[in-house]
């Protein structure tokens, strides 16, 4: 019996796969537990439609990420911060991924999720700093920061 897997089943198939399995196994286990459904011509068509929609959505997300990368790669895109500095040359407050995301939105209208900004520890130094940002699983860019003394 041909089935379409609705979830990953160890040793049998992954979600979205169409495979031939024994009829008893399909009816008594896979279909009862909603791990798979019978592969009729209609359900195969639905699956192909879903996969096309998923690919289209992924392509749109990638295109959006590339547009953000193009803006971040421009020389004039430099996020300005003015911080109070102590006698040792370190800032009183630290610059976090959240602050960077908010300032990027405020100064350039570019929306980047704070969870995508790769920051090992908050920034406490003044000067020009480049911070990597993971825009998409296969696309990274650099945010340029200019931190000056207030």
Swiss-Prot record:
BP terms from Gene Ontology: translation
Keyword terms, alphabetized: Ribonucleoprotein, Ribosomal protein, RNA-binding, rRNA-binding
Pfam families: Ribosomal_L9_C (PF03948), Ribosomal_L9_N (PF01281)
Entry GO terms, CC: ribonucleoprotein complex; ribosome
GO MF term list: rRNA binding; structural constituent of ribosome
Cross-referenced InterPro entries: Ribosomal_bL9, Ribosomal_bL9/RNase_H1_N, Ribosomal_bL9_bac/chp, Ribosomal_bL9_C, Ribosomal_bL9_C_sf, Ribosomal_bL9_N, Ribosomal_bL9_N_sf
Family: Belongs to the bacterial ribosomal protein bL9 family.
Functional note: Binds to the 23S rRNA.
Listed name of the protein: Large ribosomal subunit protein bL9
Organism of origin: Streptococcus pyogenes serotype M18 (strain MGAS8232)
